[in-house]
C-alpha cells in the first residue's frame, strides 16, 4: 500500500472514533478522570478552567448518563465515576448513584468552573484536591490530547511536542487534497478501510434512538409526524434530513449511545455518515462501495476542516455536509468533477451558518446542512455548480482555502461577540 494511503488511514483512525456525549464537556470529564488516577482518592473539590470555545460548546448540552447540562456535572462525574482508559467514552458506565454523588459535590459549592484566557481553542485544565493532595491534568489542542499532568505541584508528565499534534493541524505535512482523497477512497484495498463501516453502525443506532424517543427538539420525529400526516413526502431528501437530525436530537439530548465522531465532533460525524448511508440504501450499492463513500466523506471533512481552528464561530456541519455530498455523487455513479461540484454547491449554500454553542438546536443546523448536501448532490449530477461567485472560487481547492481565510481572518470577533452574548 502507498505510504501516502497509510498516512490517510492513520489520520482517520486518530480522529474518527466513538464519542459518548458532546465532546467539549466530555473533555472535562476525561481530564477529571485522568486526574483521579493520579490522586488515587475521591476529590473534596474540583476546579475547571476552559477556553472560551470549550465553554461555549458546553453551556447547553446534556452530559450522557447524568440527565444534566454543563461542565460542572461533566467534571464531577468524570472525577467520581469516569474511566480514564475509555477516552471519549469516559462516562459510559456512570450509575445514578454516582451522578447523585457528583451533584452533591456541586450542591456543596465544591466544583468551580471558569473561563481562562488562552490562545488554544481547545483547552481544559482540571484540578482535583483531596485533603493535602492535589492532582492537575491539562488538555490542549484536542479533546483527549493531554499536555501536562502534575501531582502536588510536581510535573509527572508533559507531552512530547514532536508527537503531540492538535487535531486542527492533523493534515500538516501530509500530501493530501480532494482529488487524492477521492482516488484513495476509490482504489485502496477494501480490507484496509472496512473498519469505517462501524460509523454506519453507531450513527444509525443514534438515529433510531432519536426517532423512537423524545430527545431535544425532536426535529427528526417532527418530520416523521409530518410524513404521517401527509404534509411532506418520504422522499430521499426528507428521509436524509429526518434521520440525520434524529441522530443529532439523541446526541444533544444526552442519549447513552456513542456517536462515531469526526475531528472531535459527534454531530459532524453524524453529518458525514447518515446522508451517505441513506444514499447507499437508495442506490442499493454493495457494502464495499458504502465503505469507500464513508472514507471519502469522513476524510474529505477532516481535510477541509484542517484549514481552520477546531472550534470557532463557523459551524463545521457545513463543510462536513459538503464532503458527504461529494460521497453521495460517487455512490450515484457521478464523476470526480461532479463530486467537486457538490462541494462547491454546499459551501455556497450554507457557509454563513455560525456556531453559537452545542445544544438541542444543533439538530436543526445538522438538518439544514444535510438538506444542502442533497440539493447540491442532485445539482452536481446534472453538472450544475457554483463557480467564481462570492467566496466560491473556480476550483474546489481554492474555495477550501477561502473558507479557511474567512474563519481565521474574518470570524474571530464574531466568535467573541457570540460568547459574550451567551454569557450575559
Swiss-Prot record:
GO biological process: L-cysteine catabolic process to pyruvate
Listed transmembrane segments: none
Tree of life domain: Bacteria
Pfam families: SDH_alpha
InterPro entries: Ser_deHydtase-like_asu (IPR005130), UPF0597 (IPR021144)
GO molecular function: L-cysteine desulfhydrase activity
Entry-linked PANTHER family: UPF0597 PROTEIN YHAM
Family to which this protein belongs: Belongs to the UPF0597 family.
Name this protein carries in UniProt: UPF0597 protein SO_1403
Amino acid at each position: 500500500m502507498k505510504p501516502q494511503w497509510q498516512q490517510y488511514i492513520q489520520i482517520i483512525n486518530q480522529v474518527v472514533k466513538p464519542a459518548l456525549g458532546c465532546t467539549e464537556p466530555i473533555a472535562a470529564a476525561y481530564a477529571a478522570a485522568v486526574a483521579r488516577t493520579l490522586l488515587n482518592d475521591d476529590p473534596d473539590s474540583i476546579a475547571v478552567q476552559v477556553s472560551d470555545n470549550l465553554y461555549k460548546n458546553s453551556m447547553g448540552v446534556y452530559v450522557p448518563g447524568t440527565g444534566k447540562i454543563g461542565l460542572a456535572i461533566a467534571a464531577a462525574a468524570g472525577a467520581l465515576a469516569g474511566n480514564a482508559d475509555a477516552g471519549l467514552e469516559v462516562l459510559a458506565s456512570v450509575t445514578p448513584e454516582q451522578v447523585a454523588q457528583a451533584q452533591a459535590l456541586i450542591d456543596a459549592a465544591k466544583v468551580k468552573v471558569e473561563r481562562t484566557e488562552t490562545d488554544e481553542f481547545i483547552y481544559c485544565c482540571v484540578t482535583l484536591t483531596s485533603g493535602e493532595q492535589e492532582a492537575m491534568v491539562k488538555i490542549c489542542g484536542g479533546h483527549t490530547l493531554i499536555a501536562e499532568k502534575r501531582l502536588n505541584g510536581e510535573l509527572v508528565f508533559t507531552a512530547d511536542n514532536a508527537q503531540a499534534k492538535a487535531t486542527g493541524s492533523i493534515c500538516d505535512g501530509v500530501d493530501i487534497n480532494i482529488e487524492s482523497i477521492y482516488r484513495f477512497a476509490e482504489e485502496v484495498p477494501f480490507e484496509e478501510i472496512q473498519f469505517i463501516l462501524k460509523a454506519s453502525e453507531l450513527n444509525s443506532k443514534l438515529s433510531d434512538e432519536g426517532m423512537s424517543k423524545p430527545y431535544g427538539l425532536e426535529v427528526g420525529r417532527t418530520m416523521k409526524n409530518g410524513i404521517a400526516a401527509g404534509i411532506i413526502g418520504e422522499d430521499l431528501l426528507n428521509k436524509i434530513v429526518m434521520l440525520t437530525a434524529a441522530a443529532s436530537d439523541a446526541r444533544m439530548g444526552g442519549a447513552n449511545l456513542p456517536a462515531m465522531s469526526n475531528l472531535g465532533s459527534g454531530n459532524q460525524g453524524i453529518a458525514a455518515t447518515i446522508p451517505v448511508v441513506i444514499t447507499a440504501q437508495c442506490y442499493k450499492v454493495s457494502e464495499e462501495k458504502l465503505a469507500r463513500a464513508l472514507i471519502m466523506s469522513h476524510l474529505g471533512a477532516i481535510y477541509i476542516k484542517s484549514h481552520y481552528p477546531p472550534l470557532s464561530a463557523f459551524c463545521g456541519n457545513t463543510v462536513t455536509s459538503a464532503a458527504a455530498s461529494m460521497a453521495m455523487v460517487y455512490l450515484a455513479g457521478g464523476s470526480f468533477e461532479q463530486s467537486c461540484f457538490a462541494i462547491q454547491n454546499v459551501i455556497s449554500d450554507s457557509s454563513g451558518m455560525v456556531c453559537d454553542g452545542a445544544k438541542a438546536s444543533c439538530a436543526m443546523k445538522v438538518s439544514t446542512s444535510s438538506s444542502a448536501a442533497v440539493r447540491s448532490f442532485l445539482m452536481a449530477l446534472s453538472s450544475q455548480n457554483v463557480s467564481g461567485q462570492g467566496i466560491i472560487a473556480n476550483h474546489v481547492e481554492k474555495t477550501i482555502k477561502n473558507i479557511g481565510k474567512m474563519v481565521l481572518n474574518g470570524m474571530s470577533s464574531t466568535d467573541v461577540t457570540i460568547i459574550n452574548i451567551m454569557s450575559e
